C-alpha cells in the first residue's frame, strides 16, 4: 500500500490500560500539524477490555467509508487496523491488537512497526496511561529538529497526575535545573544518571528515528541487563547529538500508586532500585565518564541496595564487581546469607515502606 509521506511516528505501547487509553488517543488526535503523522498503537493482548476500548474509539473517530484508505488485516501475531481520522486529516492510526502477550515471553514488538516507522524522520513515544495536552507539541518539536540538525532529541516540561488523589504536580526545580544546563551539554549525561537531576519525561520527547535505529543493537543489549531502558536511550542519543529542553508543559505523566507494604511488593521495588543502581555504574564505565566523586556515589548506592536486596533473594548473582573501602561493610555483606540477618532486614523494610506509604 502507498502511504502518505509521514514525518513523525507516535509510538504507543500499552497493556491493561483500558481506563486511560482514551486520554492518550485524544492527545494524539488533537495534534495540529502541517504534515501527516501516524500513531502506532500496540496492545499487548490486554485482559481488561482495552482492545475493545481502542476498537470502539477507532470505529467512532476514523474514516472507514467506501473509498477510504482504511484496511483491516490479520497476521500470525496480530489483528491490524489502519485508518485516517475523520476530522484531522493529517492523523492516521495503525493499531496492532496482539494475539499473545509479548512482554511475558520477552518477545520484541518494535519490528512489527517498521512498515510505518522506517519512513518517518522522527519518533514520539507515549505509553497508554500517559497523554498530551498541547495540540502543538509535535509541530513545535519537529520544527525545532528541522532547524537544528545537530540536535538528536528534544523534550518539554511535564506535569504529574497522581491517580489516587486526583492532584497535579509540577516540579519547578526540574524546569529551572534543565534550563540551567542548556549551555552545558558536556555534563547533561552525568546529571541524567545522577538520580535524574536533569529530568526527561518519556512522553514529552521527540527524537530522530535514524539515530535511534543506529543504536538498536546497543539498546537491545541494555534491555537484557536492566529493567528500565529510557535512561540508557537518552544517554546514547545525547552522545550522538545535542538535546533541547522546552519549558512548555505539553504532557501529563500519570502515577498510579499502590500498596508497598507487602513483602512481594517490597522485593520487586528493591529489584527495580537495584537494576537502576546497576545501570548507573555500568553506563558510567560504558560511556567513559571521568568524575570520581560520581563514581564513588554510584558505587556506594549499588552496594547498599544490593545488600538490602540480598535479604529477599540470596541467590541473586551480581554482574558488577564491588569495590570495598570499608571492611565493616564487606564483612556485613559476607554474612548476608545468615537467615536471622535477612529476617531483621525484611522486618525493617516492611515497617519503613508501611510508614512511608501512610504519610504520603
What are these regions (language model features)?
Residues 17-30, 52:
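Short, well-formed alpha-helical segments that are part of the catalytic scaffolds
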Residues 29-96:
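Acidic donor-binding segment of Leloir-type glycosyltransferases
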Residues 110-122:
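Active-site nucleotide-sugar/metal-binding loop of Leloir-type enzymes
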Residues 136-171:
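Conserved donor NDP-sugar-binding/catalytic core segment of glycosyltransferases
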Residues 156, 174-266:
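Conserved nucleotide-sugar donor-binding catalytic segment
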Residues 186, 226, 249-257, 263-292, ...:
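Catalytic core of nucleotide-sugar-dependent glycosyltransferases
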Residues 302-360:
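Membrane-interface aromatic/basic loop that binds lipid-linked glycans or pyrophosphate carriers
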Amino acid at each position: 500500500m502507498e502511504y502518505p509521506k509521514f514525518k513523525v511516528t507516535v509510538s504507543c505501547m500499552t497493556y491493561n490500560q483500558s481506563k486511560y487509553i482514551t486520554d492518550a488517543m485524544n492527545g494524539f488526535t488533537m495534534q495540529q500539524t502541517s504534515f501527516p503523522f501516524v500513531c502506532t498503537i500496540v496492545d499487548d493482548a490486554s485482559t481488561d477490555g482495552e482492545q475493545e476500548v481502542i476498537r470502539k474509539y477507532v470505529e467512532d473517530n476514523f474514516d472507514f467509508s467506501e473509498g477510504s484508505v482504511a484496511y483491516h488485516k490479520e497476521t500470525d501475531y496480530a489483528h491490524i487496523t489502519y485508518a485516517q481520522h475523520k476530522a484531522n486529516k493529517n492523523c492516521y492510526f495503525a493499531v496492532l491488537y496482539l494475539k499473545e502477550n509479548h512482554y511475558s515471553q520477552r518477545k520484541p514488538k518494535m519490528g512489527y512497526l517498521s512498515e510505518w516507522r522506517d519512513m518517518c524522520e522522527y519518533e514520539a513515544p507515549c505509553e497508554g496511561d500517559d497523554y498530551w495536552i498541547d495540540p502543538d507539541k509535535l509541530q513545535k518539536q519537529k520544527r525545532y529538529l528541522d532547524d537544528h540538525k545537530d540536535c538528536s532529541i528534544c523534550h518539554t516540561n511535564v506535569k504529574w497526575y497522581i491517580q489516587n488523589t486526583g492532584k497535579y504536580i509540577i516540579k519547578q526545580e526540574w524546569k529551572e535545573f534543565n534550563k540551567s544546563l542548556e549551555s552545558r551539554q558536556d555534563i547533561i549525561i552525568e546529571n541524567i544518571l545522577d538520580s535524574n537531576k536533569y529530568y526527561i519525561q518519556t512522553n514529552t520527547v521527540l527524537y530522530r528515528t535514524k539515530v535511534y535505529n543506529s543504536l538498536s543493537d546497543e539498546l537491545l543489549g541494555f534491555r537484557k541487563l536492566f529493567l528500565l531502558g529510557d535512561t540508557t536511550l537518552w544517554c546514547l542519543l545525547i552522545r550522538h547529538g545535542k538535546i533541547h529542553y522546552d519549558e512548555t508543559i505539553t504532557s501529563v505523566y500519570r502515577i498510579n500508586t499502590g500498596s508497598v507494604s507487602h513483602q512481594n511488593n517490597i522485593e520487586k521495588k528493591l529489584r527495580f532500585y537495584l537494576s537502576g543502581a546497576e545501570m548507573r555504574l555500568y553506563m558510567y564505565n560504558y560511556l567513559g565518564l571521568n568524575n570520581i566523586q560520581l563514581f564513588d556515589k554510584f558505587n556506594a548506592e549499588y552496594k547498599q541496595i544490593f545488600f538490602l536486596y540480598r535479604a529477599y533473594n540470596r541467590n541473586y548473582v551480581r554482574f558488577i564487581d564491588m569495590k570495598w573501602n570499608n571492611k565493616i561493610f564487606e564483612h556485613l555483606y559476607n554474612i548476608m546469607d545468615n537467615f536471622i540477618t535477612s529476617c531483621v532486614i525484611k522486618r525493617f523494610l516492611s515497617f519503613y515502606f508501611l510508614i512511608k506509604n501512610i504519610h504520603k
